[in-house]
């Protein structure tokens, strides 16, 4: 006899009899439901991954992801040299002086974030500089490179001057408290096509430190580039050098990324309900089949099949629906996600050449498929147990 017999009979029940078209339709309906649920889940989460990655590249990639600073407000690089900054998940370290500033031009006033950088070390904004070089930020010249949106808001062009004020570095005078301020020369702009164009500005690190009224040679801290910026929670828990403190992007953009993550989780939860409904469909269809097959189950028991084997027969039938549906759904979902930007213009959803960011994560697709299979398998337990509990004498009494 074909071994294992439970697998053979379970697959036969899955196919159904040729004459019983409605029974076969109900049996395959569960498979279709799981396929659609997994496909929708893979497609939507791939798009959400794309949005998350785009935000990470366009925002976190262009701003300080983390800063290792001193508890005293400014850091002396001699006391904590770059070689002492050895942290997990950090791939690059550079000095930085940064702070929130108020910008005043002849036409307008704006707020921004000053990034004091070393002109000799390449900055993430360097590829986006417009008609200016990073090396033009010479110390003592008080030159500044503005984001294009920020320059437009201030109404300034190359060659103009703006007043930069630091409210946190104010000084007391007979006329009251006056913020530290200095005139800077606009030598160019950068256009990263990101929101940082509206508030970031680049200056020489020495000029920035003088404006912040730091002791000579001091900086705000060491700028850290992270391997995985979104996993900053775990990175911030590691042991830091003595006397230092950790600051990261969550101070400025934590709420934005938390909202994106929550939206992604909620979309995943809602679409998981499709898989849950399909799982209930497995329970229903399998329960009806158990009632229909009670006579056959009794005959199988009289032929020597144990209750465990009877249970396996119906578990194979129900689980096969989940396995087939999960594999088909994962494959179709990945295919749909990869071709989404080609299909959207056909139905007129995307206009003007816009495209959805899509990032298919193989591990995520595999996890979704495995979870769908597990849900389908769990949904077979009760009907299969009911089938195994069938009493042959009772079932055959009216046959």
From Swiss-Prot:
Keyword Metal-binding: no
Membrane topology: Multi-pass membrane protein
Transmembrane segments: 25-45, 270-290, 310-330, 358-378
Gene Ontology CC terms: ATP-binding cassette (ABC) transporter complex; outer membrane-bounded periplasmic space; plasma membrane; plasma membrane protein complex
Family: Belongs to the ABC-4 integral membrane protein family. LolC/E subfamily.
Functional summary from the UniProt entry: Part of an ATP-dependent transport system LolCDE responsible for the release of lipoproteins targeted to the outer membrane from the inner membrane. Such a release is dependent of the sorting-signal (absence of an Asp at position 2 of the mature lipoprotein) and of LolA.
Record's protein name: Lipoprotein-releasing system transmembrane protein LolC
Species, as recorded: Escherichia coli (strain K12)
UniProt lineage: Bacteria, Pseudomonadati, Pseudomonadota, Gammaproteobacteria, Enterobacterales
This protein's encoding gene: lolC
């Amino acid at each position: 006899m074909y071994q294992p017999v439970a697998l053979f009979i379970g697959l036969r029940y899955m196919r159904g009899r040729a004459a019983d078209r409605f029974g076969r339709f109900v049996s395959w309906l569960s498979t279709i439901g799981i396929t659609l649920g997994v496909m929708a889940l893979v497609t939507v989460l791939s798009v959400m991954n794309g949005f998350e990655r785009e935000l990470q590249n366009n925002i976190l990639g262009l701003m300080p992801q983390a800063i290792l600073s001193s508890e005293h407000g400014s850091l002396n690089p001699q006391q904590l040299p770059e070689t002492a900054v050895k942290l997990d998940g950090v791939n690059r370290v550079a000095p930085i002086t940064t702070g929130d500033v108020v910008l005043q031009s002849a036409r307008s006033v704006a707020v921004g974030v000053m990034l004091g950088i070393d002109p000799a070390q390449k900055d993430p904004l360097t590829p986006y500089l417009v008609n200016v070089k990073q090396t033009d930020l010479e110390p003592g010249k008080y030159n500044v490179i503005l984001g294009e949106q920020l320059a437009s808001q201030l109404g300034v062009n190359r060659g103009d001057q703006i007043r930069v004020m630091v409210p946190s570095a104010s000084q007391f005078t007979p006329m009251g408290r006056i913020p530290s301020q200095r005139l800077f020369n606009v030598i160019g702009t950068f256009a990263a096509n990101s929101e940082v164009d509206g508030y970031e500005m680049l200056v020489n690190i020495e000029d920035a430190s003088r404006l912040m009224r730091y002791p000579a040679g001091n900086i705000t801290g060491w700028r850290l580039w992270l391997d995985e910026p979104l996993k900053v929670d775990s990175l911030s828990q590691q042991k830091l050098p003595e006397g230092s403190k950790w600051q990261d992007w969550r101070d400025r953009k934590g709420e934005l990324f938390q909202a994106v993550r929550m939206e992604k989780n909620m979309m995943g939860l809602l679409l998981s309900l499709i898989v849950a409904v399909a799982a209930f469909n497995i329970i229903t269809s399998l329960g009806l089949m158990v009632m229909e097959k009670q006579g056959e189950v009794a005959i199988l028991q009289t032929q020597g099949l144990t209750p465990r084997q009877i249970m396996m027969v119906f578990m194979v039938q129900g689980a096969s629906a989940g396995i087939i549906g999960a594999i088909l759904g994962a494959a179709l979902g990945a295919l749909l996600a990869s071709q989404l930007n080609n299909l959207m213009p056909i139905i007129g959803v995307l206009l003007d050449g816009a495209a959805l960011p899509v990032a298919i994560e193989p591990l995520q697709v595999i996890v979704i498929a495995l979870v769908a299979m597990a849900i389908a398998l769990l949904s077979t337990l009760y009907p299969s147990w009911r089938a195994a509990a069938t009493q042959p004498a009772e079932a055959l009494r009216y046959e």
